[in-house]
UniProtKB/Swiss-Prot annotation:
Record CDD domains: AAK_UMPK-PyrH-Ec (cd04254)
Regulation: Allosterically activated by GTP. Inhibited by UTP.
Entry's localization field: Cytoplasm
Organism superkingdom: Bacteria
Organism: Chlorobaculum tepidum (strain ATCC 49652 / DSM 12025 / NBRC 103806 / TLS)
Protein name: Uridylate kinase
Record's catalysed reaction(s): UMP + ATP = UDP + ADP
């Protein structure tokens, strides 16, 4: 039994780096590809957005005096590098994959056309959205929210390295409180770092649920799709 039909999976660039903190860890890439293959074998339609923080962070570079717009474009290119790496890992497992970018790169990717992206999903292809929104000042979290709404995804799944949403950083505070469910309003009120404010607001306005879960535990993604209570569900709640 599959709980969700169409899912947008958001993976941070840092998670691809593994223990090294930089670059792309082949083992992590392989593990993510295995999880996505299991999901497609269940009949789920999978779209992905990958960050670029393992290669370049535009906001950090801007803080170090680089022009913010230039830095953000460099960050967008970093997401394309990660997307190409994951596309290769998926295709080696026999999964038909399309890389779709917000910036035209005709030699390596299709331009983003909503109807075409949806058609790929309907045909059982995995769609990777690269280059963010194509505009500076917007994060890949916001890009994930936007693309999820455009393709009419049932849910955004944000893969992290912790179990879900806590009231403080569980890696620093062993007594941090875990939330199995939480409303968008409480996320905003408590200033919890689920996604940036623009991304959360987009999801709230379009009643798009978010599940935050530990992507580093093998099989978690598949268990979530089967309806097991994995991670934290961010939803409308009582407003």
């Amino acid at each position: 039994m599959r709980k969700y039909r169409r899912i947008l999976l958001k993976i941070s660039g840092e998670s691809l780096a593994g223990e090294s903190g930089y670059g792309i860890d082949a083992g992590v890439l392989e593990s993510f590809a295995d999880d996505i293959k299991e999901a497609t074998d269940l009949g789920a339609e999978i779209a992905l957005v990958i960050g670029g923080g393992n290669i370049f962070r535009g906001l950090s570079a801007a803080a170090a005096s680089m022009d913010r717009v230039q830095a953000d474009y460099m960050g967008m290119l970093a997401t394309v590098i990660n997307s190409l790496a994951l596309q290769d890992a998926l295709e080696r497992k026999g999964i038909f994959t399309r890389l779709v970018t917000a910036i035209k790169m005709e030699q390596i990717a299709e331009p983003f056309i909503r109807r075409r992206a949806v058609r790929h999903l309907e045909k059982g292809r995995v769609v990777i959205f690269g280059a963010g929104t194509g505009n500076p000042y917007f994060t890949t979290d916001t890009a994930a929210s936007l693309r999820a709404i455009e393709i009419e995804a049932d849910v955004i799944v944000k893969g992290t390295r912790v179990e879900g949403v806590y009231d403080s950083d569980p890696e620093k505070n062993p007594n941090a409180e875990f939330f199995p469910k939480i409303s968008y309003v409480d996320v905003i009120r408590k200033n919890l770092r689920v996604m940036d404010m623009t991304a959360i607001t987009l999801c709230r306005e379009n009643t798009l649920p978010i599940v935050v879960m530990n992507m580093n535990i093998k099989g978690n993604f598949t268990r979530l799709l089967k309806g097991e209570p994995i991670g934290t569900l961010v939803h409308v709640g009582e407003e």
